[in-house]
Amino acid sequence: CAVLISMLLKEAEYDFYAVFSVQEEIGLRGAKAAAYTAAPDAAIVLEGTTAADIAGVEFSRRVCALGGGPAVSFMDRATVYDKAYYNAALKSGITCQPKAAVAGGNNSGAVHTSRGGVRTLAISVPCRYIHSPASVADKCDIENALRLAEYMLKGICSGEIE
């Protein structure tokens, strides 16, 4: 939410829809309705994701780590992300990390299959203790998620990222 609110507080070069959706955990209901109504040409889904970079968790089960920048997914349980967007994000020069697991999912699962299909990228802020009353995130990861979202929005809207 903080990344999207920060984007809305700035004057953007391009028009875009911002959606704060509900009921992601019980069927992506808000995202389904929003994607169908807005009928986007492209989508950048912003979210928090499980970092699991804590003591007692095997390294192979750590999806991403705090301080490594936002995580960018190539695939998850519900979505195969746009390859050009994924590669552009990783080559942007903005600190980010590939998400190391294809488990789980997010609102992209509803957005990318809406209507005739929507090219989609997910930018995920690594969080410890996600879905608890208090999650922990690295402020630099949030700032880099904002920078990456703005970079991708500009690149997609201008046609620089195809």
Regions flagged by a language model, labelled:
Residues 40, 55-72:
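Active-site loop ensemble at the mouth of alpha/beta enzyme cores that anchors a bound cofactor
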Residues 19, 42-44, 121-123:
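Hydrophobic/aromatic beta-strand patches that form the interior of the parallel beta-sheet core
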Residues 35-54:
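A glycine-rich helix N-cap at a beta->alpha junction
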Residues 20-27, 48-50, 127-129:
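Acidic, glycine-rich active-site loops and adjacent beta-strand->loop/helix elements
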Residues 29-32, 53-58, 109-110, 133-134:
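Short, well-ordered secondary-structure micro-motifs
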Residues 65-146, 152-160:
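Active-site-adjacent substrate-binding region
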